[in-house]
Amino acid sequence: MISVCEDFNGVFGRNAARMRDICQKIGALPDVNKIVLFGSYARGCAQSESDIDLAVFFDCQDARLLGRYRQLARICVNPVIDIQVQPFHTYELATPCGIIEEIETYGLELRVY
């Protein structure tokens, strides 16, 4: 089950403000349902060279997902931190397999208000 995280400072340390800004921009995109951190940062074992893995779940038609991915890629380009972002449909959470299983098990939903 995906846990909720609102403590950006505790998770991202010195990159907290940048990540909050990036998540706010992602959250402003049409059809975004949730932003989930997964990988080493979510498991609490990130190293200085670790990338930041984000899964963004959308409520949109398949035809729109490619466009949303392009928007995500533009938002997440950052010279300071390595962000790897993947778009998914929310229906993929209903029967998780593969990477969705990891996201479901270890993921932290990043909420920004």
Stretches found by the model and what they are:
Residues 38-40:
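Glycine-rich beta-strand-to-loop/alpha-helix junction loops that act as flexible
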Residues 53-55:
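Short, well-ordered beta-strand segments
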